Amino acid sequence: MISWTGSNKPIEKIGLVGCGRMGRCMLRSLMDKGFQVVAYDKFPAAVQGAADMGAETAAAPSELAGRTSVILMSLPGPVQLQEVLFGAEGLKEGLTSDHVVIDTSTVDPATTRSNAEGVEETGAAYLDCPILGRPSATGKWMLPTGGNPDALDKVKPALLTFASDAVHVGGHGAGNALKLLNQLMFSCINAISSEVMAICDHVGIDKEVFYNTVAGSSAATVSGLFREVGKSIVNDGYDTPAFTVDLLIKDAKLGLQMAKDADAPSVIAGTVQLYNEIAHAEGLGMQDTSALYKVFSRHYEKLCGQAQAD
């Protein structure tokens, strides 16, 4: 990580690359707090959606970089980041020492460090700033941030339009490392919540009664995720995903590889990933992560059928 000596002039205009679900949440919050936004997305419908919300639009990332010095990215993964940063008419073509590029995507730390190195060749600063929080919790998000702390201080007023805090956690890649650890926890809590709800069906406990009783208690096992997953299972809310099985597989895969590369391979999260992949194989990839309940439910139904046959 190099030192950054960019401008500390007040920020009035923000660039946004990626106008999907999370990007739109950021766009709305920024504009509500008085920031102008210049948006870019490779999909015309997403660009039009941003324009309909009141944003200016850019035809290419390089053009966007010429119109604002603070740029947020919200993209699906490493391939899209590489294209936006270093592809034809990419951001790098328009970056200067006054720019701060903020990546809110969930990617692996190695990708972040490589991207930061390429961006910082221009004198610009690069921050990995993934989001801890659901779209419905916009404004309450936590942003673990890796990179130059001075650059973070400059852009924090913009970040705090959609987050409760942005915390410096280390150098390049540290923000994403923390996010991936969180995603491994998410995967495991989602799985055990789904499994227990499936077991209810076989031990004489109505799963709705179980959910309402536990979620309404002060038991140490109760978490926000259990409340969401359990409620989705009780209400058959699989087709209105807060987070899909396929996205969880992607994030957990990155986290498992990070742990393996650090010679600390995960045992529990690694096992859970097998069930995530079974869910995908059974056609549940675009459903809410609570659809893991269906995997466990079918498993126990088969076991019961075999026991009755014996």
What are the residue ranges of the model-derived segments?
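NAD(P)+-binding Rossmann beta1-loop-alpha1 motif at the extreme N-terminus of oxidoreductases
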Residues: 1-73, 99, 104, 135, ...
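Hydrophobic beta-strand scaffold residues
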Residues: 37, 57, 126-127, 166, ...
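Rossmann-fold dinucleotide-binding core
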Residues: 84, 107-184
